[in-house]
């Protein structure tokens, strides 16, 4: 009985590790989805629901959290030494802040959504980019401007041209989005036909 409990514990720990660990190659969408087939299903569902391309969802997550489910902004430092508070409440795959996450849950009815779950994170990105298209008239295929709005917020978008940092970040997201897109053209059909599940 004791051995059975120990084995069960190892299975649970393995399951948690497999679900939460960062994919080995986050620069390759095919590699990501070969390791995390459920992620492909969730991202595809989000695209079907909101119209936000899978490759843009991935590019935003890579920039925001590096696919780290527990990602948080680094703490600020007092006198460059003493750890201080974090600059924002950003958390999880999508790095959504508390207020926007609560708005998402309220508007979508997804009351049990959590930022550490990939399924909820890509749905959040779909919701946010869809609202960006509605509010700012930015196409969901415009990775550069969609990311600016994602990072700066709908109200802060208008001032981005004076912000070199966000421009450089948005260019990186746009470039990565295009790379993911080309990769998915090569492996998308095989992912669609696969029936097995890889965590």
Where are these regions (language model features)?
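Bacterial N-terminal signal peptides that target proteins for export
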Residues: 1-8
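Catalytic glycan-binding domains that act on GlcNAc-containing polysaccharides
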Residues: 21-192, 198
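C-terminal motif of bacterial Sec signal peptides marking the signal peptidase cleavage site
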Residues: 17-18
């Amino acid at each position: 009985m004791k051995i059975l409990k120990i084995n069960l514990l190892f299975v649970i720990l393995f399951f948690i590790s497999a679900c939460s660990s960062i994919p080995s190659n986050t620069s390759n969408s095919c590699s990501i989805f070969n390791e995390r087939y459920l992620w492909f299903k969730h991202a595809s569902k989000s695209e079907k629901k909101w119209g936000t391309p899978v490759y843009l969802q991935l590019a935003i997550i890579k920039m925001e959290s590096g696919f780290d489910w527990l990602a948080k902004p680094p703490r600020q430092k007092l006198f460059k030494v003493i750890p201080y508070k974090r600059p924002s409440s950003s958390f999880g795959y999508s790095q959504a802040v508390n207020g926007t996450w609560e708005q998402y849950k309220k508007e979508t009815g997804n009351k049990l959504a959590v930022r550490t779950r990939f399924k909820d994170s890509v749905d959040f990105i779909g919701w946010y980019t869809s609202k960006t298209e509605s509010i700012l008239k930015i196409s969901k295929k415009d990775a550069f401007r969609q990311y600016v709005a994602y990072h700066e917020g709908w109200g802060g978008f208008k001032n981005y041209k004076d912000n070199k940092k966000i421009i450089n970040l948005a260019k990186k997201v746009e470039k990565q989005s295009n790379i993911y897109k080309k990769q998915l053209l090569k492996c998308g059909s095989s992912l669609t036909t696969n029936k097995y599940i890889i965590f």
